[in-house]
Each structure stands twice: as C-alpha cells, then as structure tokens.
Amino acid sequence: MAPFTKSVTEVQVESVIFPPEVKPPGSSKTLFLGGAGVRGIEIQGKFIKFTAIGVYLEDNAVPSLAVKWKGKSAQELTESVEFFRDIVTGPMEKFTRVTTILPLTGQQYSEKVSENCVAAWKSLGIYSDAEAKAIEKFIEIFKDQTFPPAASNLFTQSPLGSLTMSFSKDGSIPEVGNAVLENKLLSEAVLESIIGKHGVSPEAKQNLATRLVQLLNENSTTDLNESENEKLNSNEVSKEEKPLQVEKSAFKEVEV
C-alpha cells in the first residue's frame, strides 16, 4: 500500500468487521478500506438493518481525488454528489462487500439492485439493449443464491468496465470470481446505488467522506514534502556550482 494509506484502520458495522485492506476476487491488487456503513429502511417507525457495506479503493484513488477535493471538509464531501460520482467513475479499481445482517435471497437482492439501475438509466436516457442484457445476466447469476446472516456479495469494479461478482458464506474473500460481466454502466451502477445521489447507505457515504478527508490532506502533505525535497535537491546541485549564492539564499530562507 502507498505510504498515505498505511494509517487506514478497520471499521465495524454491527457485528461485521471490515479489515483495512483486502485483495479482491479477480484482482492482483490490494485495496484499502475507504469507508463502511449499514443499509436499512424504516418500517413502522423502526429502523431495520439489512446489510453492512464496505467500499474499498485502489491506492491511486487518493492522489486522483486530491486534485479536486483536498482541503474540503467531511461535511462538504458528504453533501457533494459530484465527489461520490468521481469515486464511482474514477480511473481506479473499486471493491464493494455487501454482508447480510438479515437473511436475503439472491433474487430479492438482484431484483432490487436491477430495479434501481434501470430506473436511473431510463431517467438519463442511456438504457439500451446492452444494459437490458447485462441486467438479465445479473439476475440470472443471483437466481439460485441465498444469503444467511454473515454471507456476502462481493463486487470488483475494474476501471476498464468489467464487474466481477463473487459470493462468500463465511466472511472470507475468494481469489476468483463466480462471474464477470463486461458492461461499464452496470459496473458503475452497483456502486452508484450505494453511495450515489440516492444511495442506499447514507452511513457508508458519511464514513467514506470522513475517512477520505484525512487521506486527502495527508496526500497534500506528502506532495508538499516531495516538493520541498525537490527544492533541497535543486539547492544541493546549485551549491556545488555557485556556493556563495546558495549559502546566501539558504540563509534568507532560515530568516523567513
């Protein structure tokens, strides 16, 4: 992992622990935990928790996001649709782990996700035959699956557009996926449905924003240190060529 992600810690959501880093199915990379939270709905005045969700990101997400978002507060990021859109569509690998708190069938889960995806695509006018076929395959892959408490749906999202899907009954992360769908819109939509404008886990969004603020600021500090090192190296070269001028310049910097 990059130096600025070594401070990443685990997150516990209910009884589910999301470790600080994982190697997703179908990937050769190790991703860090961006954030995690619960998904639930209010039923008759009571909030019922259905799943715990963890979102992992490739290391290059930090410098990529820092270009636009460093210096922002956690609240600003939490409230920014564009920030989460940059995560969903950014040129980095993403991994999402959805672990059940209450039992679900594969059909229940896939149909709800598909319904949200199709509605979003139609509202944007981007629902085509390719997406319709991808949704059919998505539902078919989940058809015979069952998810008792502690079981997980695992999604590895490649920046090239593929979506690797895996299943785990005991919290472990398999090395290979159960199926791969080559549809960029669907790949992005799965994560979008969780942390997007109408995402199903506001808690995961807030946790993601809060944790990334620290990493973005650390990355900014790293950039500053690298810049200072470049200046020092430059001064060392200049010192050999023009010792008197450099000593004078260095002295002025100390005074300031």
Curated annotation (Swiss-Prot):
Belongs to the chalcone isomerase family. The record marks 109 as: Important for catalytic activity. Residues 228-256 have a biased composition (Basic and acidic residues). The gene is CHI. Keywords: Flavonoid biosynthesis, Isomerase. One of its GO terms (molecular function) is chalcone isomerase activity. Its EC number is 5.5.1.6. Catalyzes the intramolecular cyclization of bicyclic chalcones into tricyclic (S)-flavanones. Responsible for the isomerization of 4,2',4',6'-tetrahydroxychalcone (also termed chalcone) into naringenin. This is Chalcone--flavanone isomerase. Substrate binds at residues 51, 116, 193.
